[in-house]
Regions:
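Sec-dependent N-terminal signal peptides
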Residues: 3-16
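Active-site metal-binding motif and surrounding structural segment of the metallo-beta-lactamase
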Residues: 39-45, 49-104, 108, 215-232, ...
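Acidic/histidine-rich helix-loop elements
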Residues: 46-59, 111, 159-179, 229-234, ...
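Conserved beta-strand hairpin/beta-sheet module of binuclear metal-dependent hydrolase folds
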Residues: 18-73, 182-206
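Short, flexible loop segments at the rims of nucleotide/cofactor-binding pockets, characterized by
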Residues: 22-24, 52-55, 79-80, 175-179, ...
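Long, structured stretches of catalytic cores involved in phosphate-ester chemistry, encompassing
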Residues: 108-109, 113-114, 213-300
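Flexible, acidic/histidine-containing loops and adjacent segments that form or flank the divalent-metal
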Residues: 18-21, 28, 87-208, 269-336
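Extracytoplasmic/secreted envelope proteins and their assembly/folding machinery
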Residues: 33, 58-62, 87-91, 117-121, ...
């Protein structure tokens, strides 16, 4: 059963509707910060990058929010999980951007570790009294698009989003040890507008991806996929990726984090897959192991990085255009 949360809004007048659903991958140097703006003007941010670095990540997020999409607050901040590269930058962001509601999978499971305890205390400092803890199957009350949670706290959907076909890629599929860290607790969701669907599973790890895919594909097919866990080999189970059949993927990797050539190789084996866009060129990868330069937002090491973003602009007819802010390169795709 889907629970849709109804929250009191500060204004009775809705924001002017836009024509597109916009998704921004804000570069936070191997962390995560994915901003979604619905046609009805709702703003949803999953993760806030790293702490420190003279407010680098918080400032990059605020720039995209206020200058690129011309919004002044975040309606829903989703913490995928409590690790420094995802929730570490939240307090710095909350000091400069208004956030209405903080969405999470529940209390951190790493509070017994000094760094995990510090992250958890930081989260409570800004989120206490504004938290919304979700379960798979829940949905946010957005205008012009839907957002349904498909994973949280090592649990997946109890019922498929679509018809739930048996997945032929499960036969002989590789299994990996169950991950008990915060990565395995990651919040994941599907955003849908018309025929278009976008999947983001945070840093969900292999064994829980397998549960979403086998024996039945609980998610269905999507058009756009944020590669799980920055393109690291601990995630991206082929039995899931081949089942959801993305046309396009975006990888939020850093120059030396994620961006595994084997993940890129695996995507090329997906039926109907067209392009991978990357936040960074993996400085350790060869040209043969990398995507077309036009689809990479940043090159070189972190110290000199300008923090270029990648965006997807989704039209109501199902077409979606990926844009690289570094060079202005854009390419349009069709939904299934």
């Amino acid at each position: 059963m889907t629970r849709i949360f109804v929250l009191l809004l500060a204004s009775l007048l809705p924001a002017a509707a836009a024509d597109t659903l916009d998704i921004y991958w804000i570069d936070v140097e191997g962390g995560a910060a994915t901003l979604i703006v619905t046609p009805g003007g709702d703003t949803v941010l999953m993760d806030a990058g790293w702490p420190g670095f003279e407010n680098r990540d918080a400032n990059r997020i605020r720039h995209v929010l206020t200058q690129e999409v011309e919004k002044d607050k975040i309606d829903y901040f989703i913490t995928s999980h409590f690790h420094r590269d995802h929730s570490g930058g939240l307090n710095q962001l909350a000091a400069i951007v208004e956030i209405d509601t903080f969405v999470d999978h529940g209390d951190s499971v790493e509070q017994d570790r000094p760094r995990g305890k510090a992250l958890w205390n930081d989260y409570l400092e800004v989120a206490e009294g504004k938290r919304l803890t979700i379960e798979p199957g829940d949905a946010l009350p957005l205008t012009g698009a839907s957002l349904t949670f498909v994973a949280a706290r090592s649990k997946g959907l109890s019922e498929p989003l679509g018809s739930g076909p048996r997945n032929p890629h499960c036969e002989g599929a590789q299994l990996k040890e169950e991950d008990m860290t915060e990565n395995g607790k990651s919040v994941g969701f599907v955003v849908k507008m018309g025929e278009f669907e976008f999947l983001n599973l945070g840093d969900l790890t292999w064994s829980f991806e397998h549960e979403l895919a086998c024996p039945v594909n609980l998610i269905g097919e999507v058009d756009l996929y944020q590669t799980t866990h920055h393109g690291l080999l601990s995630s991206g189970a082929p039995q899931l990726v081949k089942a959801v059949r993305p046309t396009v993927a975006v990888m939020n990797n850093g120059p030396r984090k994620g961006g595994s050539p084997d993940v890129w190789k695996g995507l090329r084996q997906v039926d109907g897959f067209v392009d991978l866009w990357q936040g960074h060129r993996n400085v350790q990868a060869t040209d043969a192991e990398s995507v077309d330069r036009k689809m990479i937002a940043n090159f070189g090491e972190t110290e000199d990085c300008q923090g270029h973003w990648i965006a997807a602009k989704v039209s109501k007819d199902g077409r979606f255009t990926l844009v690289n802010s570094r060079n202005g390169f854009a390419k349009t795709y069709s939904s299934k």
